[in-house]
Amino acid sequence: MRWAFLYGYAGYGAGAARNQGEQAMEAFRNVHLFDEGGPVLIFGGPYSNLQATQAMRAEAQRRGIPSERCICTGDVVAYCGNPAETVAEIRDWGCAVVAGNCERQLASGAQDCGCGFEEGTTCDLLSAGWFSFASAALDQDARNWMMELPDSISFGRGESAPDCFCIHGGLTDISRFLWSCSPQAEFDEELRELATRSGKGTPNYVFAGHSGIPFDRRIGDVRWINAGVIGMPPNDGRQTGRFVVLDQGKVEVFDLAFDHIGARAAMEQAGLTQGYHRGLTSGFWPSEDVLPPELRRDVKAG
């Protein structure tokens, strides 16, 4: 595992600096994993969902994809009922992890998730409950591990000009929500920031997370792929998470079935009954505040 340190960047951009409790980062940190071909499994948002994390690990093993070729786009800890156990499972598995906003916030001892929710929205209000539960459940060793996670992960084609980069939300803002319908200018801004920070030009692929809904969009010569998350359904009425596999230039999105009944029970046992527990079994989020209008259910149904 090769670490590349690029100095001169204090934080993740103005919006992220606010979200991350004014935490200053002395360097942009990228880890370059490998150059060899072969399948790569990429997933996001375990979200403290131990059942989904165990299912993802088992699926990688079933596919014969070793841990060093499995990459998480961050937010190991979030809404669900087993934050400490999920961190332990991810660490034991040994997959690579990009720092998400939740990891940055928990590592710094912040009082909120820094998710980028607008103040006063349902998502913002609900986050207070699950974030305080998660923070209380994690020991200092887990926080130290989170503190060491990189800002991005690259692989393929050589460290000097990687073929693929994995990030969380954005590089201008770790909590930036980018959707399939977001203006191209927002993606262009992120690609410029990636080129500036990495100093390695433009990759062929960017894999991201944070927003929770997978998509594959071409931005000029770059394919921007949101890998989805495994810890919560993508608001489509099904009780499965999502992940992607890149193999020989082909990207496929797959469903991940997990014990959603058990995951909901763990949330209920923890007292996390503000709505996300129902989302595990209904397949729908408790609020669509964060979604752009065209992705909300009432619009899509019409």
Where are these regions (language model features)?
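Beta-strand-turn-beta hairpins that frame and shape the catalytic cleft
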Residues: 32-41, 155-165, 219-223
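Active-site neighborhood of phospho(di)ester-bond hydrolases with catalytic His/Asp-centered motifs
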Residues: 43-44, 69-75, 97-101, 167, ...
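Active-site neighborhood of divalent metal-dependent phosphoester bond hydrolases
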Residues: 92-155, 161-163, 173, 181-202
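Active-site environment of divalent metal-dependent phosphoester hydrolases
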Residues: 47-51, 78-81, 102-108, 172-174, ...
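N-terminal active-site segment of His-dependent metallophosphoesterases
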Residues: 9-13, 18-93
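Acidic, His/Gly-rich catalytic cores of divalent-metal-dependent hydrolytic chemistry
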Residues: 31, 35, 217-302
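A contiguous binding-surface segment within folded domains or other stable secondary-structure elements
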Residues: 176-235
